[in-house]
From Swiss-Prot:
This is Acyl-CoA-binding domain-containing protein 4. GO terms for molecular function: fatty-acyl-CoA binding. Disulfide bonds: none annotated. SUPFAM superfamilies: Acyl-CoA binding protein, Kelch motif. It comes from Arabidopsis thaliana. Residues 538-647 form a coiled coil. Changing residue 28 to A: Reduction of oleoyl-CoA-binding activity. GO terms for cellular component: cytoplasm; cytosol. Binds medium- and long-chain acyl-CoA esters with very high affinity. Can interact in vitro with oleoyl-CoA, barely with palmitoyl-CoA, but not with arachidonyl-CoA. May function as an intracellular carrier of acyl-CoA esters. Plays a role in the biosynthesis of membrane lipids including galactolipids and phospholipids. Pfam families: ACBP, ACBP4_C, Kelch_KLHDC2_KLHL20_DRC7.
Length: 668
């Protein structure tokens, strides 16, 4: 059986020479070629330059000719280090190696100096070693993304041989082989046929698009070189799928569904990608209906042949609490208007389904706070409720992960923007009773945000598999927990009936308590103890370990400080840009206000002109009436004059004829 190590390794310069030996550098030209062939070009050149700086010193050799581009690139890398001290070059050499290959030390050759302290599994006596009346606690080293080994005095996380998972209710770190994925968080994880797939995620603010698979039988990592299906036969150069983070990865029909997620250039609506492990091909799933707006950090829950999507954060950083359902038979989206008080807008929460009827939402976060509330949606009546809970409720958290085993919902990780959640808890979904399964201490990957959690099987028993996360450092560790029967059944022994809407489906069964006790005792058989080490070497090892720990913490603090400085500088730049935009907008506002005032003055003048025209129009109407009256009077006068003229021109003949005009005048 392999003997896991629990040490931070030898001190410098021995650690540097061990790393150089692992890389294959011995100062010869052939060794440099080996390095270049094993690592990416930029990493290989930097490792070569640091090795030369540490072993030879500053570059004083003449520049190679342009006909030798490889040698010229190596010379430029070495020359760029200037007068860097040798010890600093050694430290950076090891740091870069650990960033590229975090598990290098465990895979190093046997000629690397052995560490001071060994940790052995399956000793004859499962009791801790006592020396001078003091009990030594177990020690576990968890390697982090940046390669530095963080030593944790915590027996809640132990090393396990890759072929055994025997400790119940305790997190263990199995040995894995193969190239581990780059450390990340906000990735997706799902299991198909005893293989855990890891897709996408976030690393140093960059979205990832790689796909890795872990064989859960052999614990071997491998990267999947995927293809992208073309939409038609005419398309010969399909565009690659955009890297993403904050998406959901669901196993469906021996395929993987990647739903939503944040991307560099987000689409307007939520997209669903499909990966077929048989053809190693990604393709876009064609859906119908009105899809949800593009988002990340949502929860996606498989309920029968449907996917239930809740919440998340859209591309404009607006938090959501809407509810959508995708029917996998018809591939049709449907937006649900539920009744009752829905959860507040949030992202990075966890969701589970109970009895194929009740959707449970726990935790999550907004821009300012994290939540610890539990909401239940009845999928038959589409009504939200907040039922009463039992036990000790978990602390507020976001970025946690959850899986269900029967009626039990296991919640792992998460954080509250201050620290990671150290307790792994379980909720019995029938009784709504919380209990703690395991607890970890220190800054370990399990107390991280954005980790993933899946369920696997080992010797017929369920095992929780956690991967990745971010707790100030990016992680790519695998941790396992095998819940005992007692932990999965202890909430069922409560006598109180289930409150709220879940009481109708409370069909919990009782089991033999004595067998639970036996299993619990069996789970405590495995202990990790320290080998017999003479006091002198132990004190020396402790001193070296303390110094290494202090140096590691110093480096972490320096890295955190540099990161904070970069963030502060970025925020200042963004603030300056915002102030500049604000100034421009204010100038535009003043200009618009001036234009508005001019338009208002012009409108006022127009109103005055209109009033004057109206007054003149009224005067014209009066004059028109007077004119018409005068015209009528004139016409009457002219008519009278004509009549008088006619009467005056009759003469003698008119008098002799009897003046017929007079008759006409006298006639009515």
């Amino acid at each position: 059986m392999a003997m896991p190590r629990a040490t931070s390794g030898p001190a410098y310069p021995e650690r540097f020479y061990a790393a150089a030996s692992y890389v294959g550098l011995d100062g010869s030209d052939s060794s440099a070629k080996n390095v270049i062939s094993k690592f990416p070009d930029d990493t290989a050149l930097l490792l070569y330059a640091l090795y030369q700086q540490a072993t030879v010193g500053p570059c004083n050799t003449p520049k190679p000719s342009a006909w030798r581009p490889v040698e010229q690139s190596k010379w430029k890398s070495w020359q760029g280090l200037g007068t860097m001290p040798s010890i600093e070059a050694m430290r950076l050499f090891v740091k870069i190696l650990e960033e590229d290959d975090p598990g290098w030390y465990s895979r190093a050759s046997n000629d690397i100096p052995d560490p001071v302290v060994d940790v052995q599994i399956n000793r004859a006596k499962d009791e801790p070693v006592v020396e001078n009346g003091s009990t030594f606690s177990e020690t576990k080293t968890i390697s982090t993304e940046n390669g530095r080994l963080a030593e944790t005095q915590d027996k809640d996380v132990v090393s396990e041989d890759s072929n055994t998972v025997s400790v119940y209710n305790q997190w263990t770190a199995p040995q894995t082989s193969g190239q581990r994925p780059k450390a990340r968080y906000e990735h997706g994880a799902a299991v198909i046929q005893d293989k855990m797939y890891i897709y996408g995620g976030n690393h140093n603010g960059r979205y990832l698009g790689d796909l890795h698979v872990l064989d859960l039988k052999s614990w071997t990592w491998s990267r999947v070189e995927t293809k992208v299906a073309t939409e038609s036969q005419e398309t010969s150069t399909p565009t690659l799928l955009a890297p993403c983070a904050g998406h959901s990865l669901i196993a469906w029909d021996n395929k993987l569904l990647s739903i939503g997620g944040h991307t560099k250039d987000p689409s307007e609506s939520m997209q669903v990608k499909v990966f077929d492990p048989h053809t190693i091909t990604w393709s876009m799933l064609k859906t119908y209906g009105k899809p949800p707006v593009s988002r990340g950090g949502q929860s996606v829950t498989m309920v029968g042949k449907t996917l239930v999507i809740f919440g998340g954060q859209d591309a404009k950083r607006s938090l959501l609490n809407d509810l959508h359902i995708l029917d996998l038979d018809t591939m049709t989206w449907d937006e649900i208007d539920a009744v009752g008080v829905s959860p507040s807008p949030r992202s990075d929460h966890a969701a589970a389904v109970h009895a194929e009827r009740f959707l449970l939402i726990f935790g999550g976060g907004s821009h300012a706070t994290c939540f610890d509330d539990l909401h239940v949606l009845d999928l038959q009546t589409m009504e939200w409720s907040r039922p009463a809970q039992q036990g000790d409720a978990p602390t507020p958290r976001a970025g946690h992960a959850g899986v269900t085993i029967g009626e039990n919902w296991f919640i792992v990780g998460g954080g509250d923007n201050k620290s990671g959640a150290s307790e792994s808890v379980v909720l019995n979904m029938s009784t709504l009773a919380w209990s703690v399964v395991a607890s970890v201490q220190g800054r370990v990957p399990l107390a991280s945000e954005g980790l993933s959690l899946v369920v696997s099987s080992y010797n017929g028993e369920d095992v929780l598999v956690a991967f990745g996360g971010y707790n100030g450092r990016y992680n790519n560790e695998i941790n396992l927990l095998k819940p005992s029967h007692k932990s999965t059944l202890q909430t069922k022994t409560l006598e109180a009936p289930l409150p709220g809407s879940l009481s109708a489906v409370n069909n919990a069964t009782t089991r033999d308590i004595e067998s639970e006790v036996e299993v619990s005792q069996e789970g405590r058989v495995r202990e990790i103890v320290m080998d017999n080490v003479n006091p002198g070497s132990k004190v020396e090892g402790n001193s070296e370990r303390i110094i290494a720990t202090i140096k590691s913490e110093k480096e972490e603090l320096e890295a955190s400080l540099n990161k904070e400085r970069m963030q502060t500088l970025q925020l200042r730049q963004e603030l300056g840009e915002a102030e500049l935009r604000n100034t421009d907008l204010y100038k535009e506002l003043q200009s618009v206000r001036g234009q508005l005032a001019a338009e208002q003055s012009r409108c006022f003048k127009l109103e005055v002109d209109v009033a004057e025209l109206r007054q003149k129009l009224q005067t014209l109407e009066t004059l028109q009436k007077e004119l018409e009256l005068l015209q009528r009077q004139k016409a009457a006068s002219e008519q009278a004059a004509m009549n008088a003229k006619r009467q005056g021109s009759g003469g003698v003949w008119g008098w002799l004829a009897g003046s017929p005009q007079e008759k006409d005048d006298d006639s009515p």
